[in-house]
Curated annotation (Swiss-Prot):
<dbReference type="GO" id="GO:0042149">
    <property type="term" value="P:cellular response to glucose starvation"/>
</dbReference>
<dbReference type="GO" id="GO:1904262">
    <property type="term" value="P:negative regulation of TORC1 signaling"/>
</dbReference>
<dbReference type="GO" id="GO:0045171">
    <property type="term" value="C:intercellular bridge"/>
</dbReference>
<dbReference type="InterPro" id="IPR038060">
    <property type="entry name" value="C12orf66-like_central_sf"/>
</dbReference>
<dbReference type="GO" id="GO:0140007">
    <property type="term" value="C:KICSTOR complex"/>
</dbReference>
<comment type="subunit">
    <text>Part of the KICSTOR complex composed of KPTN, ITFG2, KICS2 and SZT2. SZT2 probably serves as a link between the other three proteins in the KICSTOR complex and may mediate the direct interaction with the GATOR complex via GATOR1. The KICSTOR complex interacts directly with the GATOR1 complex and most probably indirectly with the GATOR2 complex in an amino acid-independent manner.</text>
</comment>
<comment type="similarity">
    <text>Belongs to the KICS2 family.</text>
</comment>
<dbReference type="GO" id="GO:0061462">
    <property type="term" value="P:protein localization to lysosome"/>
</dbReference>
<keyword id="KW-0225">Disease variant</keyword>
<keyword id="KW-0991">Intellectual disability</keyword>
<dbReference type="GO" id="GO:0005765">
    <property type="term" value="C:lysosomal membrane"/>
</dbReference>
<dbReference type="InterPro" id="IPR018544">
    <property type="entry name" value="KICS_2"/>
</dbReference>
<protein>
    <recommendedName>
        <fullName>KICSTOR subunit 2</fullName>
    </recommendedName>
</protein>
<comment type="function">
    <text>As part of the KICSTOR complex functions in the amino acid-sensing branch of the TORC1 signaling pathway. Recruits, in an amino acid-independent manner, the GATOR1 complex to the lysosomal membranes and allows its interaction with GATOR2 and the RAG GTPases. Functions upstream of the RAG GTPases and is required to negatively regulate mTORC1 signaling in absence of amino acids. In absence of the KICSTOR complex mTORC1 is constitutively localized to the lysosome and activated. The KICSTOR complex is also probably involved in the regulation of mTORC1 by glucose.</text>
</comment>
<dbReference type="GO" id="GO:0005764">
    <property type="term" value="C:lysosome"/>
</dbReference>
<keyword id="KW-0472">Membrane</keyword>
<dbReference type="Pfam" id="PF09404">
    <property type="entry name" value="C12orf66_like"/>
</dbReference>
Length: 445
């Protein structure tokens, strides 16, 4: 006869309630999570003790998470609302929650019939949740910082990556209890996506093909995983005259914003690396693919050239000081190529309608050199007419390493609003501060 398998000890009621709560929170079902702990609290209100205190804190945590993912707290002006309509800032909400959890950790209000081993579990979980709440406050501050950057001429994504990395390192493995794993997973998914996107933004601006491609792909894959969580959830809608229907849960604003940032970076990536990407497919297929981008920079510039009979529109990459520059596409890390010199330090990484006009390039570089301070303002449009070659040049700089030039083989006025507004529009779309402004729900962008 084989030995009898010992029966597993029954899971304490408290543990089962906690596991259900965090599994709901892990799939962003804030209302279900909140309802469950409130029902449990109502059923145990005579019990008192740490358990009741923790249930109250968890109901507040579910409500705080809902506000956090909605991003409605961004850009709130202190004292700008009446006492009755004022929404508490996310920091106030989480600070209050942190204080509640601290009381459970220290065992204040622990009078009640909770078993000692359960008390220990509740204290341990509350301690880890304190770290989670602190991490949330820091990431909320990070979103606030990104939102305020929308008014800047240039957003330094590399600096943002450094700040986010520091937060991730600070809280790594700080809320690792198995019961909290759904919460930890959803937190990690969010910061991973954000980090991949900000790294991609920094790398596209440095014209680094493979690293930006890898980060965009990683962000895309993780956003798909996240999106499937909402697809699997259905919410039932009861109709006025009976009957009901089910539909997928609407994702929170934070998820939708990360999707928007990814799509904007994808449009910019497909423009900056158009040459390398077009080598992988046919011209007609490439045109179809870029037309799906929003905005479609390639299509927009092609239309402008046809409409105004421009000789050329180029995106120039200033690679001076960039030791790793090797030209379009991917290059083996150990392949050697001599650093560019002279005019090759200013390649046209995009040139429409065909290859860069070599005869105009000395003029373009001369204008870039002479008007450096104007171009470095990242908002001025520079005009130059050369009567020797009967050609007009309009230049602007959307970001530090890149300049857009329009070349006309005829005389054009520096006050021509069509050309200036077009350059401003393309430049603004490449910087896209509107994406950062649209972090706040209801903002245009």
């Amino acid at each position: 006869m084989g030995e009898s398998i010992p029966l597993a000890a029954p899971v304490p009621v408290e543990q089962a309630v906690l596991e259900t709560f965090f599994s709901h929170l892990g799939i962003f079902s804030y209302d279900k999570a909140k309802d469950n702990v409130e029902k449990e609290r109502e059923a145990n209100k005579s019990a008192g003790g740490s358990w009741l205190s923790l249930l109250a804190a968890l109901a507040h945590l579910a409500a705080a998470e809902k506000v956090y993912h909605s991003l409605t707290y961004l850009g709130q002006k202190l004292g700008g609302q009446s006492f009755f309509s004022r929404k508490d800032s996310i920091r106030t909400i989480y600070t209050s929650l942190h204080n509640e959890l601290k009381k459970v950790v220290t065992g204040r209000g622990a009078l009640g019939g909770t078993a000692p081993h359960v008390e220990e579990l509740l204290s341990h979980l509350s301690e880890q949740l304190c770290f989670f709440v602190q991490a949330r406050m820091e990431i909320a501050d990070f979103y606030e910082k990104m939102y305020t950057l929308s008014t800047q001429k240039f957003i330094n994504a590399e600096e943002l990556v450094g700040l986010l990395d520091a937060i991730m390192k600070k809280y790594s493995s700080r809320f690792h209890h198995p019961i909290l794993s759904p919460l930890e997973s959803s937190f990690q998914l969010e910061v991973d996506v954000l980090c991949h996107l900000l790294k991609a933004q920094a790398q596209v601006s440095e014209w680094k093909f493979l690293p930006s491609l890898v980060n965009l792909h990683s962000a895309h894959t993780k956003l798909q995983t996240w999106g499937q969580i909402f697809e699997k959830q259905r919410e039932t809608k009861k109709h006025l005259f009976g009957g009901q229907s089910q539909k997928a849960v609407q994702p929170p604003h934070l998820f939708l914003w990360l999707m928007k940032l990814k799509n904007m970076l994808l449009a910019k990536f497909s423009f900056y690396f158009h040459e390398a990407l077009s080598r992988q497919t046919t011209a007609s297929e490439m045109k179809t693919l870029t037309a799906k981008a929003n905005p479609d920079f390639f299509g927009k510039i092609s239309s402008f050239i046809r409409k105004y009979d421009a000789a050329n529109v180029s995106l120039i990459f200033d690679n001076r000081g960039s030791e790793s520059f090797q030209g379009h596409g991917y290059h083996h890390p150990h392949s050697y190529r001599e650093a560019p010199k002279g005019v090759d330090q200013y390649p046209a990484v995009v040139s429409l309608p065909s290859d860069r006009p070599v005869m105009h390039w000395p003029n373009v570089i001369m204008i870039m050199t002479d008007r450096t301070s104007d171009l470095n303002s990242l908002e001025k449009v520079v005009h130059f007419y050369d009567d020797k070659v009967q050609s007009t040049y309009f230049l602007t700089r959307p970001e530090p390493h890149f300049t857009i030039v329009i070349i006309f083989e005829s005389k054009k006025s520096e006050r021509d609003s069509h050309f200036i507004s077009f350059l401003n529009e393309v430049s603004l779309a490449l910087k896209n501060p509107k994406v950062f402004a649209s972090l706040k729900p209801g903002a245009k962008g």
